[in-house]
Amino acid sequence: TKKDGEEKVA
């Protein structure tokens, strides 16, 4: 998901 312009992958 994208949070604060940061892409995180589970």
Curated annotation (Swiss-Prot):
Highest taxon in the source lineage:
Eukaryota
Stretch forming the signal peptide: none
Record keywords: Protease inhibitor, Serine protease inhibitor
Q: Provide the function of this protein.
A: Strongly inhibits trypsin and plasma enzyme(s) activity.
Record's family? Belongs to the serpin family.
- Which GO MF term does the entry hold, naming one? serine-type endopeptidase inhibitor activity
Protein name per the record: Serine proteinase inhibitor
Q: What is annotated about its quaternary structure and interactions?
A: Monomer.
